[in-house]
Amino acid sequence: MKEAIPGAGLHTVLRSLVATLPTPDRWKVGIYVALSLASALAGALAAILLVPLVQPDARLPFEGRWFHASMSMGWRTTAFTGVTLAFALLRWQASCLGARLVGRYGMRLRRQVHARLIAAEIGPLAASSAEIANVLTYNVEIVVQGFSALQQLLVAGVTAMVSLSLAFWVSPPLLLVAPPLAVLALLASRFYGREQIEVGHRYVADMTRLFWHSEDFPRRLRHVRSFGREDVERGSYGEVSSDLARGYARQLELIASGRLILELLAVGGIALLFVLAQRWHGIDQGALIAVCLLLGRLLPYLVSTRQSVQQMRSAAPAFELWQRYMHLPTSHAPPAATARPAIPDAGIHLRRIHVAPPIPGIELGDLVLRPGELVLVQGDSGIGKSSLVDVLAGMARPVVFDACVGGHAIDYDAYRAYVHHGAYVSQSVRPWQATVRDCLRWAAPSGTDGQFREVLREVGLDKHLDTALHDASSRLSGGELQRLLLAQVILREPAVAVLDEATGALDAASELAVLSAMKRRLPRSLLIVVSHREGVGALADRCVTVGPAIRSIVPSHAGA
């Protein structure tokens, strides 16, 4: 797939949009164009058949055996009605097919970018959560509008080609006005093009800022209220909303301005057509009416074409953002289920690991990870604990990795195979399922209600399985949500469980009780716990301390 160039021209966006279509849908686009062509032919023919109904003495260019001047008005009306019905049915069929294509296109874009994010390396995603939310939601809508505009451009192009061809067939002299008008229309289509792209870029950026204001709103609201900054928050949100309003209004103004230019050109063209007909002797009145009807059919398409071009330009920055996330580096594919070895009792000996960032990095050496043990990772905030545990969880590749199992050296991909069946719970993650049962079944699809109740007792959560997680009357506290997520870990029975400050909402005694229960219930699991509380060291088999002065980590045996 080709990567879109920021600020690229309309032809580049068109090429990139088409490149995202799979082959079956390209064939369906071809069918859509064919239906549009048939619809345009039927519509143009209906316009010509209207002439003898308006002026009975007019002669049609295709008069012959099946249609001639001596036909009764009833037959002429029947022919016009039949062709008009065919036009309506063909246009309806094309519209239905186009709607299905647009729907599938949006679905595919969302699935593709979501799948790419699921497979992406953790590092590049750390500081862009609001932008990611935008990419997964509204941004795709803008791109889909661009794809729908592309369909409308195809219809307009086919209709214009058919109408102009038939008009030339009916009366070639009258079409002398077409070339200069076409040149003027082409020039008009370029008006405001650069500004439209700039407005589109700003609109996408402002929408991302709006997502920042909306992200995790309850926690944000507590923070704002505690600092007494409600007025500042309202002002900041209002500023973003105003920028969005101005951007949206400017987009509509640009569309309206372009439409006005095209309508003025159309009025001038029709007036010029009548002047030409009066001055050019020998032009049949019926031919003049037919040409006017054929060209009149193009007026709404001229207006919609301008709007479609503007929508395509607005979609360009949104499509560039989508493609930027589609080019994120991905982590290596997880090993097959049959290729996941169990961590041996002797453990995995990590002889040397270098993690960066943070700069200058973290150096870890001589640490053994054994099943059934609890490794405590401590250190000041922001010093790199999460970066280290990302590596230990197999989610982020280190700069240097030197390890062995049973005396045999392994690389990081082999290490990932050992720890792939894992569980990772961080402090900020919140369950998105509807009920307690749904949350537990997500972690253990084959689990029973009895198993779910038992594991809830183990973590000290006294809640019914049907308790709603997001209902105002039954919302769980922060500590209860953490207990629920830890229950997921027990049901998972992972090879490695990483708890990155996942017990911070519990008091010290509850934290020790829950961790003790997890260690008891998971005798074959390695627990890696990040915590600021010194008391957790009493449960730890090994402690890793990230020092504030030098970023060299020396694991020490707990209690040593």
Language model regions located:
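Hydrophobic alpha-helical segments in the permease module
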Residues: 80-91, 182-184, 259-262, 266, ...
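Membrane-integrated ABC transporters
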Residues: 1-46, 61-77, 94-98, 102, ...
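Juxtamembrane loop-to-helix connectors within ABC transporter transmembrane domains
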Residues: 118-162
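Cytosolic ends of transmembrane helices, especially the final helix of ABC transmembrane type-1 domains
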Residues: 229, 253, 298-328, 334
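Conserved "ABC signature" C-loop
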Residues: 429-471
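Transmembrane helices of ABC transporter permease
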Residues: 32-38, 152-202, 272-286
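Helix-to-loop junction immediately C-terminal to a conserved catalytic motif
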Residues: 393
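An intracellular "coupling" helix at the cytosolic face of ABC transporter transmembrane type-1 domains
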Residues: 19-26, 122, 138-146, 150, ...
